[in-house]
């Protein structure tokens, strides 16, 4: 298990190329069934934070996958600390875009089975883009804000944004696995929040900010972070 001795609050910067594996699904299995995009309620708390992140605060991409921000401090308070597992997904905004997704990840809400199909969900900015020089061929993918491995949330349109393989695998996945491994190995809980960052009326997020903090030890000896991916559209 990957452990850190201080709170890690990182802004993930990813130049998006190719398709995603874990947390995202290739566009090749896209469905035309729009009726399955209806809003799904969370399995726990519904009081997700209205926290937002301004794209103005995101550093320009400099080739680095991650860059620390806000002194490595996640934005959770003592009142947020709870050992009761929950997951919560904000309502889509007026443009139909995902907003904040939040959870207290515990073993009791982690999935016991394999992830199901998510091709019926079409996040904002979605279209099929296929290139021979892209790994897996399909450039754009459906990316979970809160990974399936953490809460078992599958085809929820409040939890899926348009992204790419680099965005997911090189950026989000290491942190998702850090959280998942910690919870599975210790039985403790992790506060976890993912906030998409949109620039103006753009339908594809500029990135996502991810925060996590272990509850039982208040993040002092385990996992705590945030990261952001930029851009979710490829450089051309």
Q: Where do the model's predicted regions map?
A:
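N-terminal, intrinsically disordered, polar/charged segments of Gram-positive cell-envelope systems
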Residues: 28-78
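Short Cys/His-centered divalent metal-binding micro-motifs
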Residues: 160-185
């Amino acid at each position: 298990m990957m452990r850190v001795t201080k709170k890690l609050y990182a802004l993930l910067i990813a130049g998006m190329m190719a398709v995603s594996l874990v947390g995202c699904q290739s566009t090749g299995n896209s469905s035309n069934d729009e009726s399955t995009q209806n809003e799904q309620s969370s399995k726990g708390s519904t009081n997700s934070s209205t926290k937002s992140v301004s794209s103005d605060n995101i550093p320009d991409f400099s080739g680095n996958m991650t860059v620390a921000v806000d002194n490595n401090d996640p934005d959770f308070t003592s009142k947020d600390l709870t050992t009761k597992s929950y997951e919560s997904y904000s309502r889509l905004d007026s443009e139909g875009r995902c907003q904040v997704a939040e959870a207290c990840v515990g073993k009791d809400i982690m999935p016991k089975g394999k992830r199901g199909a998510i091709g019926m969900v079409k996040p904002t900015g979605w279209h099929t883009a296929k290139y021979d020089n892209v790994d897996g061929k399909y450039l754009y993918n459906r990316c979970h804000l809160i990974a399936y491995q953490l809460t078992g949330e599958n085809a929820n349109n409040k939890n899926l944004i348009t992204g790419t393989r680099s965005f997911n695998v090189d950026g989000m996945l290491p942190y998702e696995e850090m959280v998942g491994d910690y919870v599975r190995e210790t039985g403790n809980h992790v506060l976890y929040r993912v906030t998409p960052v949109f620039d103006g009326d753009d339908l594809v997020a500029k990135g996502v900010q991810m925060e996590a903090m272990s509850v039982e030890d208040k993040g002092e000896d385990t996992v705590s972070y945030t990261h952001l991916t930029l851009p979710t559209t490829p450089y051309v």
